[in-house]
Amino acid sequence: MSIQNAARRKTAPEIFARKSGEPIVMLTSYHAHTAALVDKYCDIILVGDSLGNVMHGFETTVPVTLEMMILQGHAVMRGSKQALVVVDMPFGSYEASKEQAFHSAARVLKETGCGAIKVEGGQRMAETIAFLVNRGVPVMGHVGLTPQSINTLGSFRARGRDEADSAMILEDAKAVSEAGAFSIVVEAVAEPLGRKITEAVAAPTIGIGASVACDGQVLVLEDMLGLSPWAPKFVKRYGDLGPGIEKAIQDYADEVRSRAFPGPEHVYNLKPKAAK
């Protein structure tokens, strides 16, 4: 297929231009087949480091590696056609220096073909974000609750519920926006703060447990489909697929053990002998 005939993907500048416009729809995906489904309805597919929790059963996102993100990012790119694909930079791949961040981000962009990367952190990461943007790397920011910082935060509690924390997170968002981020994820903050951030920054905000006033929303796909045994308060279950999948597996196991499967329609017959 020629480049001219290929489906055109959304770009970071197009997402940036959606500020105060039609809400931006984002979901996570880690596989080609779910990416193909999500791609039909979403503006952005996030290959989140939450794959550590969802796919690998880690308690936090800290153990996730750059190689894991690249592998799943490539899968999502193969499964999608139109959405902007954003790949999370995992813990330890960008914090040491601006140069480390660029080296890691360049690997992700080159090896997956994705359109942007995401980094967690506010004022402390602003210089790094500007460094990346100035070198051709589109960056999505992430402020509020930053899961990669769980060992210093101590818990996954909502942020910005007192005046001091709220003021700090607002300044984080401003710094990330001014550094050149094309959008900012705002996670698990008090609703008035989510509104205030959205009004204060030039970049579109994408809320996850923030505010309906944000410029867009994101959820973890498995959470909203009912595939996770537990989900945060900010998740709305749009499906309850877990019990249905379990029932299908149970039925399969029962039919195998009773020799009801495979049936005659599931096996191959010999070719008929040629007529003499």
Curated annotation (Swiss-Prot):
Gene3D superfamilies: Phosphoenolpyruvate-binding domains. Its cofactor is Mg(2+). 3-methyl-2-oxobutanoate binds at D49, S50, D88, K118. Mg(2+) binds at D49, D88, E120. GO terms for molecular function: 3-methyl-2-oxobutanoate hydroxymethyltransferase activity; magnesium ion binding. Keywords: Cytoplasm, Magnesium, Metal-binding, Pantothenate biosynthesis, Transferase. The keyword Metal-binding applies. Catalyzes the reversible reaction in which hydroxymethyl group from 5,10-methylenetetrahydrofolate is transferred onto alpha-ketoisovalerate to form ketopantoate. Homodecamer; pentamer of dimers. This is 3-methyl-2-oxobutanoate hydroxymethyltransferase.
